[in-house]
Amino acid sequence: MGSEMCIRDSHNSGFVSPVDVLTQNEINQSINEIENFEEETGQPIDFPHKSRCHQLFAWADYLVHHPKILDAVEDIIGPNILCYHATLWVKPAKSNSFVRWHQDGTYFFLDPAKHVTAWVALTVADEDAGCMQVIPGSHKNDFIDHNDDADPNNMIPRGQGLAIEVETEAAVGMPLQAGQMSLHHTKLFHASFNNMRDTRRIGFGISYIPTEVKDIGNTPANALLVRGEDKNNNFLPEKRLADPESQDQFDYHLSLMKQFRKRQDEGASFSKAKLND
């Protein structure tokens, strides 16, 4: 996808999709590493390991630094790029898992709201698999009030969703093949619904921000420089993954996650992702 088209679509509709980014070998490597970890632990990958997983796993570190992903992100937010967060989204086969209509940046406490999410499909993420649904142009709204819910099938840790009626007749799907990604604005209304396929739907969502964005949260935020230079130093600097899946790395990851969840869950009426201090 050319730079001008990427910029235009992002400005007009709030999203860009699909964008080809990964080779089959890169897809296989990511899936193999995820499945190896699951085999070692004896259970499907879940919180906290699925969150900020670029600080645990080589495949995730590779993807947050992937040049094709960063080239497309740079078209939208410029050359100096921080990774603010990243999450592995796994919908089991034939599951009731869903994500409510929401705006990503509601509890990110970033100013200005120039955050963009790259959602990378590691398996097929079509309509049957519960691909992302978006409301084109909704990113031109301000942040709308959200509320929390405790539905165990809601994949968002604090269960947040828009506290308004969403005009879903305007929604469009963003189906992706494995190896493709979508990009969407932090204010874009989006959701996803049940996976009706016989296989898991696996996607990797990466939150990118330009270095000039300021942290306005009560709890300071960490961020990882992935391209360019950071002359602003608005975030606590994060070290790049050094020793994948080592005890030292697990400890560092846990410290980052405690900081992040404290920040994200402030004022939450419910959270599936609280971590003890």
List the predicted regions and their residue ranges:
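Non-heme Fe(II)/2-oxoglutarate
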Residues: R8-A72, S95-F98, L188-D277
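A short beta-loop-beta micro-motif enriched in histidine and acidic residues
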Residues: Q103-H115, E169-A170, L176-Q177, T199-R200
